[in-house]
From Swiss-Prot:
Summary of the function given for this chain in its UniProt record: Negative regulator of class I heat shock genes (grpE-dnaK-dnaJ and groELS operons). Prevents heat-shock induction of these operons.
GO biological process: negative regulation of DNA-templated transcription
Leader sequence residues: none
UniProt KW Iron-sulfur keyword: no
Similarity section: Belongs to the HrcA family.
Pfam families found in the cross-reference section: HrcA
Record protein name field: Heat-inducible transcription repressor HrcA
Key words, A-Z: Repressor, Stress response, Transcription, Transcription regulation
Transcription regulation in keyword set: yes
Upper taxonomic lineage: Bacteria, Pseudomonadati, Thermodesulfobacteriota, Desulfovibrionia, Desulfovibrionales
Organism: Nitratidesulfovibrio vulgaris (strain ATCC 29579 / DSM 644 / CCUG 34227 / NCIMB 8303 / VKM B-1760 / Hildenborough) (Desulfovibrio vulgaris)
GO molecular-function terms, A-Z: DNA binding
Gene this chain is encoded by: hrcA
Cited InterPro entries: GAF-like_dom_sf (IPR029016), HrcA (IPR002571), HrcA_C (IPR021153), WH-like_DNA-bd_sf (IPR036388), WH_DNA-bd_sf (IPR036390)
Amino acid sequence: MSALGSRETHVLTTIIESYITSAAPVGSRTVSRRSGLALSPASMRNTMSDLTDMGFLEQPHTSAGRIPTPKAFRLYVDALLRQSARRDEAPLHMVEALHGHEPEVGALLRRASNLVSEHARQVSMVLAPGPAEARLRSLDFVPAGEGLVLAVLVLEGGMVRTRLVRDDTHFGSDELVRFGNYINAHYRGHTLSGIRNSIHHELSGGGAQLEAMCAQALALGSLALDSIDDDRELYVNGTRNILDQAEFAELGRMRELMDALEERSRLLELLDRTILEDDVHVTFYPDDVSGGAQRRAPDGLRGCSMVSAPYGGASPLGVIGVIGPVRMDYRKVLPLVGAVSRVLTQLLRERFATG
């Protein structure tokens, strides 16, 4: 907290951490007892008054105590982030909890989301990788009725996508098997985005003259791959933890937050905004959200914050996030999110095209 002197920093940190624990305004006696500073009552009150004047504290009308403002939490969190940036290794128990778990990507991410919600006692979210950067394990074509073919894509990590594509040529079963074998022989282990580009290049005449069978296989493969959208799964856990938070004790406020957590498209947008962050990042709502109506956070998230971190290395695959009241325990949550992010990066980098 370099913007403040050592005394003000110590007092403000004590108030913030007392408020995190109690959810109640913090008085000067509490600060004196917990801070360990040898200040007279008058000096302590003066310091708290100065912090109030600087916008770091506010005083509810019904109490002589103070509560930290979002400005105070931002200063506090930034100091913690600088400390946690020095920790490169994930705690062993986190590694063990996720290593050796289900090999399928969805199961791994569900486990990660559940692990974070259990430890943070907040709502956790994990945005899954899209299929574009997943590596192809196999592509098979199956007749699906008059003029239709079912394309079955199996991707590394256990993701499966099926799509119906038109077949105006009415290929037989044997031909469809040969088409699948050709694509698998040439493109297994490549990313879907890379395969799309290669096939488009070949079909547009950029490659050597293609034999008829090869051209037909690539044309059908192109139809199948172009129909695969980049829709992404979002794994949410721990919504019941909201019930334990004093901020959401009022029924109407709780419903607002629950409604916000059900707005999947908005949550995806909020997580996607943080995917290019270098490491753990904290967003306060609504203070850190700018832009037009299309970029606003759901109203139900007011007074909340999100701790998030991308996973996947230089080319991020997804984001892990924790949503809770601004008063969440950042000393616990920041290293937790960072640790799980690093473990997911280790486990998934072999299955996707990551740096």
